[in-house]
Amino acid sequence: METEKEDRKTDRIEKEENKRIRKDKNEGIRKDKNESLEKEKKNGAVNRSVTAVILMAGSGKRMHTEEKKQFLPLCGKPLFCASVERFISWLRCEELLLVVGAEDKETVEGYVQQEGWRKEKKISIVEGGAERFDSVAAALHFIEEKGNPENYVFIHDAARPFFTEDLLERLYKELQYSKAVIPGIPVKDTIKVERDGIVEKSLDRKTLYAVQTPQVFDFQVLSRAFKSFLPRREEWKDKITDDAMIVEEFSKERIRLIAGEEENIKITVKEDLRFLKEKHKNFFPF
C-alpha cells in the first residue's frame, strides 16, 4: 500500500516537473518570437493584429454522444481548449471570440476563468446562432461594435484541434497578396456526381481541394459580404457550407488557396478523436 502511494506521488512529481519544463521552454520560445515580431514591426512588415473567431455553437449530431464534441476530453481538457490555446500562444493574435450556444455560455466562461486565459489575451464569449453563418454574423457584429475592425479575422472550427502555428503564419503572410485566404489539401479519392442513384459524371480531382479552417479575411471584406448575404439567408442557407462561399458569392474578392495540413481534420465521429489522440500524444503543451 505504501509502495503504491509512493509510486503515485512519484508519478505526480514527474508530471509536474515535465509540465514546468514545457512551460519554461514555451516561454523561451515566446520571448524569441516576440523579439522577432518587434523587429518586423520596426521594419514595417507587420501592422495589423488578428482576431480569432472560434466556432463552437454546433450540436455535433454525427458524434452520437450526449456530450457535444467541443467538450469531449482531449489530453485532460475539453476539445475546444486546444484551439484556444494555440491562438493564445500565437503572438500575432490580439483577441479571441468564442462563439457558443446560449446554453453553454456559463460552462465556457468557467473554463476561461479556470485556465486564466484572460491574463494573456482579450477573450469574449459571443452567443452563436442556429447555423454556422449565423454564428459568424454574430461575431462580426460584435467586432464592429466592441472589437477591433482593423484586425484580420481568422475563423476556425473548434472541432479542428490539430492545426499548427506554422499554418497560422502562412495564412497571415498570404494576406499581403489577398484579402481572403483559405487552406486546403488535394482530394485523393475520385469524386462522382450522382443523381437518383446514377453516376452522371466524374470530376477532375486535380482541380479539387478539401477546404479547412482557419479561413482568414480582411474584416471589411467579410463584413460587407455577410451584409449582402443575410437578406437572402433563406434562399441560400442550404447551399452555404463555409465562410469563403459567402465571399465567393457576395463579393468581388478573389480567394487565395494555400496548402493546408493533412492532420487538420474536423472531428466528426468518435473514431476521429480516438485515432488522433493516440497518434499525437505529444502534440499539445498540456
Question: For the regions a protein language model found, what residue spans apply to each?
Answer:
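Intrinsically disordered, low-complexity terminal tails and inter-domain linkers enriched
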Residues: 1-47
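Short, flexible, basic/aromatic active-site loop/helix in glycosyltransferases
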Residues: 193-217
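Acidic helix N-cap motif at the loop->helix transition within catalytic regions
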Residues: 106-112
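Residue-level signal for inorganic ion chemistry
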Residues: 54, 80, 139, 157, ...
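N-terminal glycine-rich phosphate-binding loop and ensuing alpha1 helix
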Residues: 47-106
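Conserved beta-loop-beta/alpha segment of the NTase-like Rossmann-fold superfamily
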Residues: 122, 130-194, 212
